[in-house]
Amino acid sequence: MSEAQETHVEQLPESVVDAPVEEQHQEPPQAPDAPQEPQVPQESAPQESAPQEPPAPQEQNDVPPPSNAPIYEGEESHSVQDYQEAHQHHQPPEPQPYYPPPPPGEHMHGRPPMHHRQEGELSNTRLFVRPFPLDVQESELNEIFGPFGPMKEVKILNGFAFVEFEEAESAAKAIEEVHGKSFANQPLEVVYSKLPAKRYRITMKNLPEGCSWQDLKDLARENSLETTFSSVNTRDFDGTGALEFPSEEILVEALERLNNIEFRGSVITVERDDNPPPIRRSNRGGFRGRGGFRGGFRGGFRGGFSRGGFGGPRGGFGGPRGGYGGYSRGGYGGYSRGGYGGSRGGYDSPRGGYDSPRGGYSRGGYGGPRNDYGPPRGSYGGSRGGYDGPRGDYGPPRDAYRTRDAPRERSPTR
């Protein structure tokens, strides 16, 4: 080896000298006078990170809480999940049980009675019963309801009837026992009747002679008062009359506007009437008696309940021994033979009756015409009085049915 080569070897770094010759693949060094290219630092390759699992998809029911939800110190914020867990056991209220009406012939023991209560206050002694054939007799109703207790009144109308007991227990028992029973091949509906509608009435004194109910209505109209009834006692004229109004407010106004005013040369006075006389109606039916039927018929009715479906008591129902006779041909004139007496003419139409009310059972469900029942058309008409269609059931008369010769009941005076 020459000296030049040895000198060059000595100038190399030790790492190069010690390395094997076959592993040295370096380029020969450049001349010192040649400019060296600047070395650009190589960028380090990015390190591959471990793959991250994607976030679990949220359930459809999970709704993210609002960003402005309040967070209190020392307490955790309530999330939507907490709210759902707190209300997951919330259940709607259970519906009330429904009791269907029993089939014909089945008793209702163990069930609440089917009152089918309608809006408004109901009587606890007066019952509404339907359906009945148009030719149903009062004696048949007495046989049905007589065993449950003394009755005050049985009133038969077209296709339905009202039965009033003296005691509430008797009425409740009648509903339980009779409701759903078959009569004339139809199940009966027995429910409580509505209470009489309240009446707003005033009595008038010192009316001029010749005054009629139309004159009183005109007087009220001139004073901007709405009326539902007007009446003047013209049979035995004593200068008294009455007006009825649809509300308490109008009644109060009438007391202020009509008291001590001059009317056809007379100064009239008016007073509130808190106990008005009952409204009489001409209809079928007419039994009244506080004692009810007692003692029983000897022979009973032919075949019991001939209509079928309802087995009456063995002993029938109480009453006079002679039984009932038939209806007289002239309408309601009492019973002709062996029964209750009565004048041939029947009812004497009061002088302050209905003008043209809408009566009868028309709308409504169980027991339930809206107005309970109204007077039949033409039953209360007449030339000396007029109702403008009052609404509501006014209940039973206070006294027994009057004959034509009986004195007329006058409006109470104070």
UniProtKB/Swiss-Prot annotation:
Residues 1-119, 269-299, 343-414 are annotated as: Disordered. The modification Phosphoserine is found at S15, S79, S182, S212, S224, S356. InterPro entries: Npl3_RRM1, Nucleotide-bd_a/b_plait_sf, RBD_domain_sf, RRM_dom, RRT5_SRSF_SR. PROSITE patterns: RRM (PS50102). Residues 52-68, 93-105 have a biased composition (Pro residues). It comes from the Eukaryota. One of its GO terms (cellular component) is cytoplasm. Methylated by HMT1. The methylation is required for nuclear export. Residues 1-11, 75-92, 399-414 have a biased composition (Basic and acidic residues). Keywords: Cytoplasm, Methylation, mRNA processing, Nucleus, Phosphoprotein, Repeat, Ribonucleoprotein, Ribosome biogenesis, RNA-binding. It is found in: Cytoplasm; Nucleus; Cytoplasm, Stress granule. Coiled coil: none annotated. One of its GO terms (biological process) is ribosome biogenesis. One of its GO terms (molecular function) is mRNA binding. Residues 125-195, 200-275 form the RRM domain. Disulfide bonds: none annotated. The modification Dimethylated arginine is found at R288, R290, R294, R298, R307, R314, R351, R358, R363, R377, R384. Residues 33-51, 346-360 have a biased composition (Low complexity). Residues 286-299, 379-389 have a biased composition (Gly residues). The modification Omega-N-methylarginine is found at R302, R307, R314, R321, R329, R337, R344, R351, R358, R363, R377, R384, R391. Belongs to the RRM GAR family. Interacts with RRP6. Involved in mRNA processing and export. Required for efficient splicing of a large set of pre-mRNAs by efficient co-transcriptional recruitment of the splicing machinery. Remains associated with the mRNP during early steps of translation elongation. PANTHER family: RNA RECOGNITION MOTIF RRM DOMAIN CONTAINING PROTEIN, SERINE_ARGININE (SR)-TYPE SHUTTLING MRNA BINDING PROTEIN NPL3. Present with 78700 molecules/cell in log phase SD medium. This is Serine/arginine (SR)-type shuttling mRNA binding protein NPL3. It comes from Saccharomyces cerevisiae (strain ATCC 204508 / S288c) (Baker's yeast). The gene is NPL3.
